Amino acid sequence: MNTVRVTFLLVFVLAVSLGQADKDENRMEMQEKTEQGNSYLDFAENLLLQKLEELEAKLLEEDSEESRNSRQKRCIGEGVPCDENDPRCCSGLVCLKPTLHGIWYKSYYCYKK
């Protein structure tokens, strides 16, 4: 029975002493992996930033294309109310105050020149 105890004690001491060495090695491995992980995170962050910049450039390009292809604002036809400060009467028409007496919805209308 003493031999079993001595053998068990010997195995226990060896396991503890070797386990501590493994613990130091594990700590060093973890530090290396952490440093590698940080460089990986920096790489991933830069890659994501590049993709976002490309996407932003595409979106801005699409916006500029839409503004180039969009229609001009429609003009106002004859006899239609217009704004004195911002007349949008079609070519050949002028925004004037009506000559007839009466109650009008707006005080200016598009008339021929």
UniProtKB/Swiss-Prot annotation:
Chief place of localization: secreted
Biased composition (Basic and acidic residues): 60-69
Entry keyword annotation includes rRNA processing: no
GO CC, alphabetical: extracellular region
Keyword Cytoplasm: no
Domain of life per record: Eukaryota
SS bonds (residue pairs): C75-C90, C82-C95, C89-C110
Residues spanning the signal sequence: 1-21
Location of this chain's protein in the cell: Secreted
InterPro entries named in the record: Toxin_22
Tissue-wise expression: Expressed by the venom gland.
Annotated segments matching region Disordered: 60-83
UniProt entry keywords in alphabetical sequence: Disulfide bond, Ion channel impairing toxin, Knottin, Secreted, Signal, Toxin
Propeptide: 22-74
GO molecular function ontology, one term from the record: sodium channel inhibitor activity
Similarity comment text for this entry: Belongs to the neurotoxin 14 (magi-1) family. 01 (HNTX-16) subfamily.
Physiological role: Probable ion channel inhibitor.
Domain remark in the UniProt entry: The presence of a 'disulfide through disulfide knot' structurally defines this protein as a knottin.
Protein name, entry field: U11-theraphotoxin-Hhn1a
Species of origin: Cyriopagopus hainanus
